[in-house]
């Protein structure tokens, strides 16, 4: 009876151990199998990714080639190595607004075939993006044949708009020509950023109007002052001038001393006495003759 509990305890200890020993290798095999299957799936996914990358790498060269071909097809024509161009601005590289800018373009044919110069054009563009046009000038048709080892000079002029004064713009001047085989070329004779200068000389409409307004205002002021002076002259009263007495009898001589008056009267008598002497003599003669 005492051994029975001990045996049961041993059985309880031994039975799980036997189960573990029996199931251990199988379990490890299952785990190993699961691991190998996972590794295979990982390897398959890696291989698939590598295949995709290889396909992408194979596709990239074709895409680049296509892009290059599109650029070649859509790109603008370039200058011919058998031709050379020069430019000369007649009045210097100053671009006054609302004034004529004139320049000369020289073309030299260094090749062995004729070149046909078709046109010459110019345009103002946005400085940060030359694809954006600000002012496009009229193209000058030339249609001039330049033989080999010969030169030709072309004249072109344009007028920058007045609102563009004081701002920088990209000036692009293109010379378009082709050879006898029909190959088209374009040479950017001038491609730089320039500043349009505000014109200071001369008179514009606003200045002329201001001068006319000031002249009219000055004329009105002069006319107003003249009218004011005339009105003041008319309102002035006529001052009466005293002429004095015309007759000597109206003169008051009471304030003169009597001696002075006697002298004055005597002088008057002396002045008047010679006129009366002939009469007295005539009277005396008449009296003597009567006697």
Curated annotation (Swiss-Prot):
Keyword terms, alphabetized: Calcium, Endoplasmic reticulum, Glycoprotein, Membrane, Phosphoprotein, Signal, Transmembrane, Transmembrane helix
Positions where Phosphothreonine occurs in the chain: 260
Topological type in the membrane: Single-pass type I membrane protein
Posttranslational modification: Phosphorylated in its cytoplasmic tail.
Glycosylated residue positions: 136, 191
Topology feature Cytoplasmic, residues: 229-291
Biased composition (Acidic residues): 35-75
Region span, Disordered: 34-83, 263-291
InterPro entries from the UniProt entry: TRAP_alpha
Ranges of biased composition (kind: Basic residues): 274-284
Transport keyword on record: no
Compartments in which it is found: Endoplasmic reticulum membrane
Residue ranges that the UniProt entry lists as topological domain Lumenal: 21-207
PTM sites of type Phosphoserine: 247, 273
Entry's transmembrane regions: 208-228
GO cellular component: endoplasmic reticulum membrane
Signal peptide limits: 1-20
Keyword hit for Membrane: yes
Purpose: TRAP proteins are part of a complex whose function is to bind calcium to the ER membrane and thereby regulate the retention of ER resident proteins. May be involved in the recycling of the translocation apparatus after completion of the translocation process or may function as a membrane-bound chaperone facilitating folding of translocated proteins.
Family: Belongs to the TRAP-alpha family.
Entry text on domains: Shows a remarkable charge distribution with the N-terminus being highly negatively charged, and the cytoplasmic C-terminus positively charged.
Note: Seems to bind calcium.
Subunit structure: Heterotetramer of TRAP-alpha, TRAP-beta, TRAP-delta and TRAP-gamma. Interacts with palmitoylated calnexin (CALX), the interaction is required for efficient folding of glycosylated proteins.
This protein's name: Translocon-associated protein subunit alpha
